């Protein structure tokens, strides 16, 4: 009940502040906490800052680098506990619901309903943006997580095709390793280990197994022979990374592929933003393909608005929400970011072949039931459960634990996190 009362109050405040802004009585202000700090990401968020300023807004940037957003969430928690929440925060998936349940999110339904968001968003994505019937977040994009990126020149020089099975990937990696090329650019950070892990789960087990294991947390799936095979593949892939991988940021791993130091990287399509920002072209300088297997893992970036005082800040929330879902921003931002628009009515004519493939695959997997939320990127589970899985995954990746031992540890960790 507390959440509902706060949301209703914030909705009235945002409506009033929007009217005051329209009448020129207030200047919209927004302090925006986000973790878009790499080259391609910074270029993308600059688009939103420019649009906000062009509409009379005053933007205070609060970027927090590191940890795939973990550091940003730590900073957010400290701000909320001190009673000084930012105006808007980059949040996604169940984390939005968790903050809503704490009664600290603002209701942006007035903006959403005035702009017909329900008709513009895929049902699955709209569901992530709503909290008990109210709109509490604005989606920016749809990222595909299960991508494999490659240096086109390296593959051509070694007569290697983009792998379509994990066996083909392993064979290519061993061939590259034999001639002194790092097969897999990887950063030894827990979230990056988890990113690779979930693509292997989807690839070896299929969407139904992925759903059972990493969404439903079914104990039989978690300790199955299929999960043992997943960890066997992770152990094999550990041998394909270089000795200096520990602690490397993801964009530095992308740079290894760009610069010809490594052949492949497994990473979401924000990596494409790095290639593009460096002036590289898909199909010419780098190659993109879904990781081996069927299905699609999605990650949706979004902004949630927090309860704040002051008409200027509330007007800033209304303006920011409207701009985030605006067709111009959705097009320009996603071209820079490497993702595809959350809105279904934005033309993809100007997008590259990788984005076209992503959009086509999202449509087909949505129809056949193999469109899956990314656990590693906060779309499938609450933090305690996803953290428990990731701890086990990274412990296995950085040790000599057997796969059989690891799956039991995985099941136990999830049980203890409940």
Task: Give, region by region, the residue ranges found by the protein language model.
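Extracytoplasmic/periplasmic substrate-binding proteins
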Residues: 35, 196, 232-312
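Mature extracytoplasmic/periplasmic domains
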Residues: 39, 105, 110, 259, ...
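Conserved N-terminal structural module of periplasmic/extracytoplasmic solute-binding proteins
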Residues: 9, 22-98, 102-104, 114-116, ...
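Extracytoplasmic/periplasmic solute-binding protein
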Residues: 134-140, 146, 170-219, 262
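C-terminal capping/gating helix-and-loop segments adjacent to ligand/active sites or protein-protein/ligand interfaces
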Residues: 139, 297, 342-346, 359-418
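Glycine-centered hinge/linker elements that transmit conformational signals in sensory
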Residues: 173-176, 215-246
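Hinge/lid segment of periplasmic solute-binding proteins
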Residues: 94-146, 170, 196-198
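Extracytoplasmic/periplasmic substrate-recognition and gating elements
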Residues: 50, 54-55, 82, 158, ...
């Amino acid at each position: 009940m507390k959440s509902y009362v706060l949301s209703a109050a914030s909705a009235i405040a945002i409506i009033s502040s929007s009217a005051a802004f329209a009448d020129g009585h207030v200047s919209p202000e927004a302090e925006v906490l986000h973790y878009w700090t790499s080259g391609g990401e910074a270029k993308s968020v600059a688009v939103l800052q420019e649009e906000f300023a062009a509409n009379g807004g005053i933007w205070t940037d609060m970027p927090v680098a590191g940890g795939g957003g973990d550091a940003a969430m730590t900073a957010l928690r400290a701000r909320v506990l001190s009673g000084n929440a930012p105006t808007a925060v980059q949040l996604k998936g169940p984390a939005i619901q968790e903050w809503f349940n704490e009664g600290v999110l603002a209701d942006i339904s007035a903006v959403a309903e005035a702009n017909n968001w329900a008709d513009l968003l895929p049902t699955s994505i709209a569901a992530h943006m709503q909290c008990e019937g109210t709109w509490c977040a604005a989606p920016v994009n749809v990222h595909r997580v299960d991508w494999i990126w490659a240096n086109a020149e390296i593959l051509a020089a070694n007569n290697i095709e983009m792998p379509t099975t994990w066996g083909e990937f392993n064979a290519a990696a061993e061939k590259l390793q034999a001639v002194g090329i790092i097969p897999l650019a990887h950063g030894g950070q827990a979230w990056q280990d988890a990113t690779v892990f979930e693509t292997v789960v989807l690839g070896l087990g299929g969407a139904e197994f992925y759903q059972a294991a990493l969404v439903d947390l079914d104990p039989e799936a978690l300790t199955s022979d299929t999960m043992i095979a997943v960890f066997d593949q992770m152990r094999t892939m550990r041998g394909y990374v270089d000795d200096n991988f520990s602690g490397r940021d993801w964009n530095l791993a992308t740079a290894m592929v760009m610069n010809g130091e490594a052949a492949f990287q497994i990473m979401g399509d924000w990596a494409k933003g790095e290639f593009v920002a460096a002036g590289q072209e898909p199909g010419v300088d780098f190659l993109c393909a879904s990781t081996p297997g069927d299905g699609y893992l999605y990650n949706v970036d979004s902004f949630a608005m927090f309860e704040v005082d002051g008409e200027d800040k509330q007007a800033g929330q209304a303006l920011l929400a409207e701009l985030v879902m605006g067709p111009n921003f959705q097009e320009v931002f996603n071209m820079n970011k490497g993702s595809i628009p959350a809105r279904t009515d934005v033309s993809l004519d100007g997008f590259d072949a990788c984005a076209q493939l992503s959009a086509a695959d999202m449509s087909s997997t949505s129809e056949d039931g193999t469109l899956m939320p990314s656990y590693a990127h906060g779309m499938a589970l609450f933090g305690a459960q996803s953290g428990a899985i990731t701890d086990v995954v990274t412990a296995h990746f950085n040790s000599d634990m057997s796969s059989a031992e690891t799956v039991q540890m995985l099941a136990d960790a999830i049980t203890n996190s409940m």
